[in-house]
Every structure is written in C-alpha cells, then in structure tokens.
C-alpha cells in the first residue's frame, strides 16, 4: 500500500513538472478602438498577464455629452486564465483595469449642436479609469507568432476637474505578437 502511494505521488509530481505554459513572453501590436503595443507573459502554466499600451478613440452618444469625441493614451493590464482546446488553439478569460490620460474632447460637435460657452468647461484634458473583463481565443502558429482575438466589455470614467463622465467601454481586439 505504501509503495502504491509513493508511486502515485512520484507520478503526479513528474506530471506537474512536465506541464508547461504555452510560451513565456510575446510582444507585438493590438488593434481595436485602441491601437498600440501589446506584451504578454505567463506567470504560471495557465495564468498570463497582458499589458496593452496605446491610443484610444471613443465617440459618445449620451444625453449629457452628445457627439463628443474623446482621445486617450491608456495602459490596459489584464490578468487571464488560459486553457487549451488543442495544442495550438487556446481559450482565455480574465479581467483588467484601464488607466489613461485623455484630451481634445471634440469641441466642434458642441459648436454644431448650438452649445453655449458654458458647455466648454467639459472640454479639455483629464484622466481616464476603468475596469473590464476579457474573453477570447489565441492561436499559436508553428512559427513564433501568436494571434489573439478577444472581446472586452467594461466600464470607464473620464475625469476632468469635478466632472465625471461614465460610459460603457467595450472593445473587440485583435493582437498579433511575436513569441520570444
């Protein structure tokens, strides 16, 4: 009985040692409403950290700020759990945050809609913060190239002085990365 238990423990230990992450690091580009640089690293066999840095464009359609264009520079780190459906195709799910700086909030739309000088207090530079979930697929080619397609619904807030504008911040992103 003790030999069987010892054998099973050794076997489980060897199997856990042979389990490896999909790859260690990758770097490339991301395209969606945010265009920029994407870096991904595996922290363990199935847990990955993705850092996306780039420029995002958001066009509003709410009653508070009708048709205002917001541009921002953002950092979007996501912590993901990846599981394999086969050796090359991997599913992922996770969550992340968004931190950024925004500017040029579409002043021409306020002029066009007949806005007053008081409306301009909402325009200008500010900060952006938000949270998102992420779900998608990643395909690893035989060459050192990984392509990821994901959906990122989230909640974002643009902040300038005492004004906060809340919005549904969603993306469908395509990332192409070179595997290091």
Where are these regions (language model features)?
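Short N-terminal binding/cap micro-motifs at the start of the first secondary-structure element
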Residues: 36-40
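Outer-membrane beta-barrel porins/channels
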Residues: 159-165, 173, 177-179
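Transmembrane beta-strand segments that form the barrel wall of outer-membrane beta-barrel proteins
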Residues: 20-35, 47-57, 153-155, 159
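Sec-dependent N-terminal signal peptides
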Residues: 4-14
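Gram-negative (and chloroplast) outer-membrane scaffold detector with strong preference
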Residues: 41-149, 155, 175-180
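Sec/Tat signal peptide C-region and signal peptidase I cleavage site
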Residues: 15-19
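Membrane-interface anchoring segments and C-terminal beta-barrel signals
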Residues: 146, 166-167, 171
């Amino acid at each position: 009985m003790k030999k069987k238990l010892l054998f099973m423990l050794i076997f489980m230990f060897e199997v856990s040692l042979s389990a490896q992450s999909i790859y260690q690091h990758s770097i490339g580009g991301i395209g969606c409403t945010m265009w920029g640089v994407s870096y991904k690293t595996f922290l363990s066999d199935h847990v990955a950290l993705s850092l996306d840095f780039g420029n995002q464009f958001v066009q509003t359609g709410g009653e508070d700020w009708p048709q205002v264009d917001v541009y921002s520079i953002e950092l979007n780190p996501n912590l993901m759990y990846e599981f394999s459906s086969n050796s090359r195709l991997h599913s992922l799910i996770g969550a992340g945050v968004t931190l950024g700086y925004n500017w040029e909030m579409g002043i021409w739309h306020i002029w066009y809609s007949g806005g007053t000088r008081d409306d301009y207090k909402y325009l200008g530079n500010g900060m952006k913060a938000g949270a998102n979930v992420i779900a998608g697929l990643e395909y690893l080619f035989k060459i050192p190239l990984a392509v990821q397609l994901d959906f990122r619904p989230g909640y974002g807030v643009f902040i300038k002085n005492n004004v906060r504008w809340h919005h549904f911040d969603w993306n469908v992103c395509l990332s192409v990365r070179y595997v290091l």
